[in-house]
């Protein structure tokens, strides 16, 4: 069995790491290079860097910052935000990213995912899915994909979309519950389970971690291959090492 991964996430806005609640109400959490260095030293399995306003403002991800982070850390680095063209992916990989996350562009042009996977290999293409719980016509809960940092509904069903993205060549899915984001109430385990049981590519759970049990639940109940968190690490509540030891005690295979 592959070890499960802990991935601290750097949401970057105007050159600073920030953290919001449900994609708004933003707090400053430091300099991206310093924050990344700290997580590298703490034993993070990977680091994710998301330029959270790049798509909204139509701005390219800051390549120089990606270069500086890549020089600082020695674990896989996933970078996303404003990725719209093959050239964007090439530039990010050249800057030192190991994987590139595609979000809004996948919704507008699904074939872009297939093209990217064909050109660079599925192993470095991550599709980021931001989902919010809505009710269908019968009043049953389902999850809908939102784009532009959670601002725009798409009408797309999140589980069906996840299946489609995996079929098109995404090597990994980063699934964020927008209802949970920053709330510290835990992952949306029903959403995670629905997606992890429907696809055969690794799924990263994101959105809502408030304690170490939430991380473990993402794996044990949500079926996630990796767990992503921000606030609990950024503001010093827990270290990566504490998180790994806690999860290992629950029988989850971790790289300690």
Curated annotation (Swiss-Prot):
It is found in: Cytoplasm. Pathway: Amino-acid biosynthesis; L-histidine biosynthesis; L-histidine from 5-phospho-alpha-D-ribose 1-diphosphate: step 5/9. It comes from the Bacteria. InterPro entries: Aldolase_TIM, His_biosynth, HisF, IGPS_HisA/HisF, RibuloseP-bd_barrel. SUPFAM superfamilies: Ribulose-phoshate binding barrel. Keywords: Amino-acid biosynthesis, Cytoplasm, Histidine biosynthesis, Lyase. HAMAP family: HisF. IGPS catalyzes the conversion of PRFAR and glutamine to IGP, AICAR and glutamate. The HisF subunit catalyzes the cyclization activity that produces IGP and AICAR from PRFAR using the ammonia provided by the HisH subunit. Heterodimer of HisH and HisF. This is Imidazole glycerol phosphate synthase subunit HisF. The gene is hisF.
